Every structure is written in C-alpha cells, then in structure tokens.
Amino acid sequence: MISTASAFYQKHRVNLLRSSYIILLLATLYNSNSSSSNNKTDKKDSESTVLENKKIEEGKETAVDREEDESSKEELTIVSKHSTDSEDGAIIIDKESKTNHKGGERKGKVDFLFKLLLHDKKCLILFITQAILLNIRTLLSLRVATLDGQLVSTLVRAQYANFTKILLGKWMILGIPASFINSLISYTTKLCAVTINRKVSDFLLSKYLSNHHTFYSVASAESVSEIQDNLTKDIYTFSMNSSLLLNQLLKPMLDLILCSFKLLTSNTSVMGEGTLALGLIVYASNSLLKLIQPNFTRLTMASASLESWFRSLHSNLHSSNEEIALLRGQKRELENVDYSFYRLVLFLNREIKARAIYDVATAFVIKYTWGAAGLVLCSIPIFFKNKPSEDTLQLKEPGNDMTADFITNRRLLVTASSSIGRFVELKRNIQQLRGIRLRLNKFNDLLDANKGDDEKEPRDERCIVEYDDSRIKFENIPLITPANQVLVPELSFDLKHGNHLLIIGPNGCGKSSLFRILGGLWPIRATPNKNHQSKLIMPRRTVDRDCAIFYLPQRPYMGNRSTFREQIIYPDSIEQFKERYHNDYDLGDADLIKILQLLDLEDLVTENMSLLLAQRTSKNDSQQLSTEDNQSPCAIKVRDAFSIVRNWSEELTIGVQQRLAMARMYYHKPKFAVLDECTSAVAPEMEQRMYENAQNFGISLISVCHRTSLWHFHNYLLKFDGKGGYQFGPFNPKERLCNEEKLLELNAILDQQVPLWERKLKDLTIAKESNIIRKSETNLNLFEKIEDPKTSKSNALFNANKGQRITSPTGQETSKRLPLFSQPSSSASSNLLRNNKSLNKKVKTKKEEGKER
C-alpha cells in the first residue's frame, strides 16, 4: 500500500505539488485579507478608547492646577474648556464608525463603486493592460534570477569571458525591456487612478447637485467638512488605492506561483517539498500575525472623521473671521482648534502604537523567520549530498552548476518571501480601502435617500400637487418642519398673477417655512384631518427656459470665482446668456447696463474698468514694455468690465449685494417673486424704486417686510399669529396704516397711564385696609373699657355731661369725665359683645393678611 502510494506520488509529484501551492496560496490570501478582525483586536481598540476617555476625564479634574509644566497645562486647559465637546466628539466618532461599518454590510446590494468601475470600458482596458504588463515583468524577473545565478557561478569559477558575455550580451539587453515595462506599469497605474477619480467624482457630483432638494437635504443632514472630504479626499484616496490594488495583489500571486513552479523544476530533488513546507510555515506565522493585527478599517474611518472635524474648525475661522474678530473670540477659537488637534493627536498616538507593535512582529517574521527558512531550504542540497563524486563532476557541467542553482533558488525564495510580505502589507491597504469605501457608500446612500426631481416636488402621496404658471394656491396645506413641529395645522390662500401678497407675523410663526415649501426645500405634507384634502397649485421652476418663480433671501448669494456678468445672470450660464442674445455680447451687456441704471449700480461698471486699467498698467510696468505695446485706456471695453472676476462677497457691501440680487430678478423677469426681507440694508428711497420697478416688470410680489412704507405695494395680506392661526384676505394699506397709527397711539397712552392707575389703585387699597384696621381697633378699645371690672363696681352712673362729677364707691368725688353714652342694658351689652367678637376676628384676619403682605 505504501509502495503504491509512493509510486503514485512519484508519478504525479509535479501536479500534486503545483495544486498544493495554489491551494496554500489561496488559503494564505484569504487568511491575510479577511475583512473581519478578531475579537481580541476589537477588544483592545475598545479598551484603548476607554483609556483615552479616562485620560480626558483626568484632565478635567486636574485642569485647575497652575503649577504644572506648560505642555501639560495646555492640554488640560483644552480638555477642561471643552469637556462637553470631548464627550460628544468621542461618541460621534464611535457611533459614526459603527454606523459606517453597518452601512457597508449591504447584503444583496451591489457596491456602486465596483459596479461603476466594471461598466467603464476605459477602466477595464487599463486593468487588463496592467495585468498583462505584470505578467511580463514577472517572467522577466525569473529570467533575471537565472542570469544572476549564472553570473555568480562564472565569478566563482573565474570565467571572466563568460561573465562578460552574460553581463553584456544577456543581462544588460534584458534591462531594456524590463525598464520599459516598469515605467509603463507606473504610467498605467497613475492613468488608472485619474480615470477612477474622474468617474467616481462625476457620478457623485452629478447626483449631489442633480436638483435643489437633494443638495439642500444632504447639506442639512451632513456637516460641510464631511461632504467636502467625501467629494475630494476620500475619492482621491480610493482612486489611488484602487489603482495600486491590482499591482499589489496580482504581482505577489504571480511571483509566488511562478517562483514555486520554477523551484519545483530545480535540479535539487527536495526543493519542491521544501517549498511546500515553507508555505505551511508562512501560513502558520501569518495566522499568528492576525492575532495582533489592528482593525485598520476602523482606524481609517475614525482618523478621517477627526481630520474632518479639525479642518471644519479652520474653515469656520476663515468664513467667520469678521464676526470672531469683533467679538474678540480668538482665544475661544484657539481653544477649540487646539482641543480638536489634541483629540487627533491622542488618536494618532494610539494608532502609531498599535501599528508599531504590528510592524515589529511583521518585519521579524517576514525578513528573518521566512528568510532563515529559505536559507535552510537552499542549504539542504549542499550539506546533505549523497554522491559527492557525481556532484563534483556536475560542477564542471554548465547545465548542472550547484552554485548557480543556489543563487537562483535563493533569489527565487527571496522574491517569494517578499511577495508574501506584500500580501501582509496588502491586508492593511485593503482594510484602509474598505474604510474609505464604506464612507463613500454611506455618502451615496445618503444621496439616494434624498434624491428628488426638479419637476416633482417632494410631497406626501395623499397631497395633490398641480402646476399653474399664473397661480399659487394653498388648500389645507400644513406647515410642518422636518423635525415634525407643527407651525400651522392647515393653511389656505389663493394668489393669482398680478396680485401682491404681504406676509407678516412674529418670529417662528411659519413665514420662512412657507417659502421653503414653495421652493421645494421641505416636503409637502398632507393635513392630518381626514375630512380635508390637501392641494397645492404652484408654478413650475422654469417655463420655456424662463424663470416662473424667483427667490430673494435677506443675504444674497455671491459667487467669488465668477464674473460680473455671471453674477447678474445667475443661475444662468454664459451659454444660456449667449443663446438668449444670439451670441451678441454687446446687446446683452446693453440690457444689463439698463438694469443696473434702475438700481444706481452703473458705477460698478466704471469701477471694474478702473480696476482693469490699473491691472494692465501695473502689468506693463512690471514687464517693462515699450510705449507702442502699452494698451491705451480706450482698449478697455464694456465687455471687459462685465468679464472681470472679483471677491464679490467681501468687496461689496450688503446693500449693494441686495441691489445686485434685485438686478438678477429684473434680468429673469419671473411671474412671481418671493422677497424675504431682501431690502433690509437698502435706503428707503431706493427700496421704493425697487418695488415699483418690479411691479412695472409685471412681477407678482410675495413679500416679508417690516417697514410700513412698503405696504402700499400689496393688495393681499397673510397674517400669522404665532399660535397656529392666520388671517388671509384683501388688504387696504391706507386703512391698515390708519388703524396701525391709532393702535400705536392707544398703546402709547396705555403705556403712560396704566402705571399711574395701578399706583393709585394700590394706594387706595392700602388706605382702605388701614382705615378698616383703625376703626376696628377703636371699637375694640371702647368695648374693653365697658367690660373693665373697676367700672362695673361703680354705684351709680350719671348723664354724660362734660363737667359732671361722679361719686366713687368710697364716697369721694372725682373729676373723671364719663364717656358720651349711657349705661347699656344687658341685652344690648350681649349684642355689642357678639358684634365686637366678630369684629375682633376680622381685625385679626386683616392683621395677618397685612403681615403676609
């Protein structure tokens, strides 16, 4: 049985070993690049996160100590000042990592990135070309290894003629195609990265800016820094790593397979089995390395989030520099930036420690353990020779040179070892690529969840939406925020083209919410009342390439990298401008100048021409041109003034920006215009002209304005009370203003008189209470005198005359005057007693109330 198996093995030895090599390679590849990290590594990551939070808590407690060194003091100050942000930041990063990880586990759904790349012909051609070039380079590497063995063999035997022949005739000639192939591989790799970047960027940007609803919803759901990183840094990292992935994956596989096959056909009989044993050692050591492997996917995602947070703070500093400078908030902002950097440094320190331990173990195993095993394998034929005489004879034969075989095998084993080492490095790169892929998938899922259509407004299925270019009608439409806060349960009004609507109400009543629903930024909800039907009639965004409804916010948008012409025609492009005026710039610019003259903005054209003249003059002076080559001032045309690019948002005041935004509306001539306090920074005289010109252009105005001087431009009023109610109806500006003046006068009188009335009422109340208490005390004193026992023992009472004397019980006369009333009877005395008791209770009650006051 054993002999039969041995015979079978000897017969099929090559095929069995080759199959074993491939199976072992696939097992090693799967073990190295498995996506899930072990539980021990995750536990270590969680423990390190807890330790990091403990450090922050310790920093909070010890931040008061002023005697520590400067560096620790800065860290503790940062932590103490931002303790809340610390906890929030840690929670956000951890939750985001888990969310992204779960978001990547989209079972049954094809990854959009892979689908996108596989459907691109250029990417496929580049990948195939790269694979062919890698195969050619591997074959050239095998040939170079053989030539290295022959060169060393000729040197050992001192065959200088053969050495020169092999060096110049084979080795140098082989270097020409090898150099060309290496350069071509580098070129195709970079070209592939650019192609992937372009493809993914076009896909995500087209989806992100496909319509206003998607752009607004995603920008509200995600932070600006995250979106910027997803569209720039993440795409760049993904494209670079994806282009290198084939090189990192295919070349080691080809090297391992071809090198092992080459070793199998070596003159040494045990080299095939030794290579298999070496492969088993590699598999076992790779399994051990996996135990200390950090979770590179999680590290990549957390690092990207922290870097985005740090960059967002710097972006906020740049965008809000004036506000921060006026409030003297640079110290607080410095603490914010320092703290975010402190969080990033803490995380990077932990990441570096984890990577350092893993790199030490990897370097020792790859370079020394596998290298020693390869040396042992190569030395077996030399130290265990069965027939030394035959081997000595073989040294003389060029085809069976042991030195050449040793060098060749050693070179092949080194190549195979380095290839396996690249597999281990590939594990890290794949996990990092997976982290970036999860972030991009999360962003793509967010875009899919908020996708919309310019022609279809986001709405509830129970709500009916119709389009009429000459009418805006709300019928039982609730005003509900995205946070499900009900501002108005049901809103109904009807506005036809030619009428003008004024909207007033307190802050937070629903004015801006109405505009957001009308602009398609918020979804249209159905009324919760089942007995009512919600219906919205509104004009489309564009009608025959003309704008049907236009929005002017309080702070207009100004593009800083656009020309003066593009500022006025925004959101139209230059191509649409040329199409509108049949490629006649002079005609179009003349219309723009007429619009600017209506708003007293024609001086901007002169200012732009002056700037162009100054730029050309300074350019000519710097280049020291001759007088004939200098451009004269007349060479600057009006077209050039409209083509200048400036930092419009910073160089123009808010008032000029609002007038320029009004010029946009005049240019587009919409049927309806929503004006949300868009003239708050404009002079009253200019404001009157702006509204008057808008009505002359046939634009129906829907205005939110607090200046009563603009009320006469409207004939309908929509008033919100801030409690969910509203009033809609015709509007008489004169009557309303008259009533408003009377109301203001009445309020002024009330403001002046009511405090006086309240003060008088308070004084009267106090006087009344004091009088009651005084009378009660007087009656009580009189009653106490009547009930005095000395008085009751008197023998006789006389009439109450002022000078009358009475006789005391001792018979002596006294000059004491009697009170001016007679002796009461017993029944009258009892009645008086009862009355005084009740009065006494009332007096006590009043006293207690007075004390409480």
From Swiss-Prot:
Name of this protein: Peroxisomal long-chain fatty acid import protein 1
Alphabetized Pfam families for the sequence: ABC_membrane_2, ABC_tran
NCBIfam families for this protein: 3a01203 (TIGR00954)
Keyword list, A-Z: ATP-binding, Glycoprotein, Membrane, Nucleotide-binding, Peroxisome, Transmembrane, Transmembrane helix, Transport
Glycosylation sites: N33, N39, N162, N230, N241, N267, N295, N560, N608, N620, N647, N836
Residues in ABC transporter domain copies: 472-747
Lineage of the organism: Eukaryota, Fungi, Dikarya, Ascomycota, Saccharomycotina
Organism whose genome encodes this protein: Saccharomyces cerevisiae (strain ATCC 204508 / S288c) (Baker's yeast)
Binding site for ATP: G505, P506, N507, G508, C509, G510, K511, S512
Topology of the protein relative to the lipid bilayer: Multi-pass membrane protein
Biological role: Involved in the import of activated long-chain fatty acids from the cytosol to the peroxisomal matrix.
Compositional bias of kind Polar residues: 794-813
